[in-house]
């Protein structure tokens, strides 16, 4: 009898660890929440391709929805996830730390919008992240620092707006910097890598409007200051602004 009970217990534990399938009530509830933001699933996904693991909705290599009601302080996005979908974590007040796997290439628009207690975002040393989309971390009021992987080439509009960042280092391979990137964010120290060559630098991507703040801006070697500062002559004559240029170094070879 004890062996039979042990067998049933093991079977129950195994079944509870398996992902819920598309017809499950758990997935139905998550889809109801998902469809509040969207009319359809992305990239031709069907409901039969959806899974639910520990209350989080996935489809193929996408993380589609992390419910607002989930109360974990830390969440490790599973290995193999390549895209955190738009609005995936929006409005979760419990989350304090997120670990992004090396496999993740895109953090979608509004993905962490209004995660008011999110204070840490961890990336791996071999991160393949390419895109941080529009408003991705907007209104994350506890996120005082973040260092993006150097693989990131696009940061979307207002991705770091209305949050308490004071320092930011642009990724080495940055190509696109969205408009109003730091709108409403008190960034006072910006750093570009010596040989960063962004092709697009958004309008009003940061401001130097606080006369009581001390600003420090480090530009790429031999940069056209007007491209990075707008009216460079005006900015550089302000007493509370220090503009530096990276030291001349050898151009890194393409990998």
Per-range role (PLM):
Residues 65, 85-88, 108-111, 133-136, ...:
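Consensus positions within tandem repeat domains that build extended binding/scaffold surfaces
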Residues 20-22:
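Boundary at the C-terminal end of the N-terminal hydrophobic targeting segment
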Residues 2-10:
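Sec-dependent signal peptide recognition
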Residues 61-67:
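Short, aliphatic-rich beta-strand segments
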Residues 12-13, 17:
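Hydrophobic core
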Residues 233-242:
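Active-site or metal-binding loop neighborhoods of secreted/extracellular toxin and effector enzymes
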Residues 24-56, 67-83, 92-106, 116-131, ...:
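Structural signature of tandem-repeat unit edges
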Residues 182, 203-209, 232:
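A structural signal for leucine-rich repeat
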């Amino acid at each position: 009898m004890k062996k039979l009970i042990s067998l049933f217990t093991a079977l129950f534990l195994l079944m509870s660890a398996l992902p819920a399938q598309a017809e499950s009530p758990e997935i139905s509830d998550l889809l109801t929440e998902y469809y509040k933001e969207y009319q359809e699933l992305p990239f031709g996904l069907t409901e039969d391709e959806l899974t639910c693991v520990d209350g989080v909705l996935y489809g193929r290599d996408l993380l589609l929805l992390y419910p607002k009601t989930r109360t974990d302080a830390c969440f490790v996005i599973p290995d193999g996830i390549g895209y955190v979908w738009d609005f995936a974590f929006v409005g979760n007040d419990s989350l304090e730390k997120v670990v992004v796997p090396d496999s993740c290439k895109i953090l979608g628009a509004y993905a962490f919008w209004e995660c008011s207690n999110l204070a840490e975002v961890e990336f791996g040393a071999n991160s393949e992240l390419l895109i941080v989309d529009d408003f991705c971390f907007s209104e994350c009021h506890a996120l005082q620092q973040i260092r993006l992987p150097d693989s990131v080439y696009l940061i979307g509009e207002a991705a770091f707006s209305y949050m308490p960042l004071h320092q930011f280092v642009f990724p080495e391979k940055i190509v696109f910097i969205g408009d109003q990137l730091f709108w409403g964010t008190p960034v006072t120290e910006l750093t570009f890598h010596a040989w960063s060559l962004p092709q697009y630098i958004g309008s009003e991507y940061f401001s130097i409007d606080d006369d009581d703040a001390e600003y420090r801006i480090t530009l790429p070697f031999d940069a056209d200051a007007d491209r990075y500062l707008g009216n460079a002559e005006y900015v550089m004559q302000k007493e509370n602004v220090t503009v530096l240029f990276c030291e001349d170094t050898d151009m890194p070879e393409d990998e």
